[in-house]
Amino acid sequence: WRSTDNIYYDFPNQRLNILRKYSSSRAWAESFRVEMEACDYFFDVSAKNSGNQYRTGSLDVAKIAGVAPDKNTEWYVTSTEAGEWMEWKELPYAAGDITVKVCYAAKEDAKIRFDFGEGTKRRQGPVVELPATGGEWVTVDAFTMKSDVNGWRRTVLNIVAGKPDLNYFTITVEK
């Protein structure tokens, strides 16, 4: 369930980010997991949520099969297509060498790309090739980058080619 109320905030993860900023000395975590279905904004070419799970809107979200009913259910973004994207308005990036890993499943080869920042500070990441996995979940090192300062960055994941199912990505920093 996700709130669609926007009276007291500008984007869905803003409340969570306020907690990260002001209630913890570890706002700049060494490792940070970002769930795909928890994006703030998205563009999906299909007209509805084909998985009919987790949130309203047309982002295709499904449950991972085989998760015991007494365990936390995991969701993932499915039925992706080239040209679709997911955006997180603010994610915390600590200073240091950052490795981004992606957990995905794909029946055919796919490609994604991360973009960071806004306006004149917007930076495209490399195109990441995701080999076919036979539909099995795998986590791969997508790329590394340098972050000079602690900061909150807009992050956009773009589907470049293929139809990967996307579970999460992690941001890990080595200082």
Q: How would you describe each model-predicted region?
A:
Residues 1-175:
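Extracytoplasmic
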